Amino acid sequence: MVGAKNAVFPKEEISRQYAGYYLNKIWKLGSYLGYGNYFKKKIAPPLTDDHTYINKLAQIPTLDIIHYNISSITNRYDFGKFHHTHQDNLEIIHKPTLKATGQTVLTYLYNM
């Protein structure tokens, strides 16, 4: 989902609550690097995912960079038609999206 074509990464609420400082820095950096079309300033509802428990139980600030957008079909947030299906495989990896996320995270890590 971090490498799907036309991915959109909003600021997910659990990430904002527990790792907001890092989330804002990474999203700002993504925009600065020219990837604002991926790293959106919009807020998304909370997700229960691995980062939820790492934040709550281990108390390690962790954020989720995940394609999470409003579906034009259901008008609700979803992960795309490929999520948890046989279509969720390497064939849907979009190199420009993967470059945007990878370059943004690596630039942040090497410059923190």
What are these regions (language model features)?
Residues 2-112:
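Active-site-adjacent substrate-binding region
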